[in-house]
Every structure is written in structure tokens, then in C-alpha cells.
């Protein structure tokens, strides 16, 4: 189930861990960010700052709400973790183009509720290994 992540050291050794998602995946991203932070990991949820998100959406377009934040905040010592049921959201795909290591936690079926539950389970399993 955790083939999405090689080992917990990838997260522990990152300067910052950026996390993002849309809709239900945004809630999972925020929850996972809290779990990482409580373990002493420098974690930032990219979908938590609505002022920055709406400024980027207004000035550049919603496809760039995550990638523009990463262009300003991130460097190659950081890690991006994305949650997406479809794996097709343009703003997620743009974020993955930013030149930092990343982990994609995407859905495997069209059952959104079941996939969102699976993503939260993965997040909890990762957190328990830190």
C-alpha cells in the first residue's frame, strides 16, 4: 500500500515538506500536514493560505495556485507530496513540474469516497513511521 513512498527518511531529511490537494484531497493534505508538523517535520500545506491562492488564481490562473507558491518557497532540498483522486487536476500537474522531489498519492479507482479514505490511511501510515 505504501509503494508511493520509499521510506520515512525521504520525509525526515527534507528541508521542508509541501503538501497539496483539491477538494477532499485538500482536507487530507491539511490533516497530513498537521500530522507531519506534530512529528517535528517542517511541513506547509499549499492549499491553506486562501489569500495567496486567490491572488495567484486571479493573476495567473487556478492551474498555477500550487506551482507559483513552490517557485517562491521551495528548493531542491524540499519535498512535495500531492494527493489527488483523479491524478488529472491541472494545478496538481503544474506543481509536479516544479524541480523538486515529489511523491504522488493518486487514486486507483473511480470511487472517490473510497479513494479519499485510502489516501487518509496512507497519510496515517506514513506518519506512524516517522
Language-model segments: residues:
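Internal catalytic-core helix/loop-beta-alpha segment
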Residues: 61-94
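Glycine-rich, small/polar surface segments that engage phosphate groups of diverse ligands
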Residues: 10-74
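A short, basic/flexible loop-to-alpha-helix module at the beginning of a structural domain
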Residues: 2-10
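Short alpha-helices
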Residues: 97-130
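Short beta-strand segments
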Residues: 20, 46-47, 82-85, 97, ...
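Short glycine/serine/threonine-rich phosphate/pyrophosphate-binding segments
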Residues: 25-31, 88-95
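Alpha-helical scaffold segments in soluble metabolic enzymes
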Residues: 31, 35, 69, 94, ...
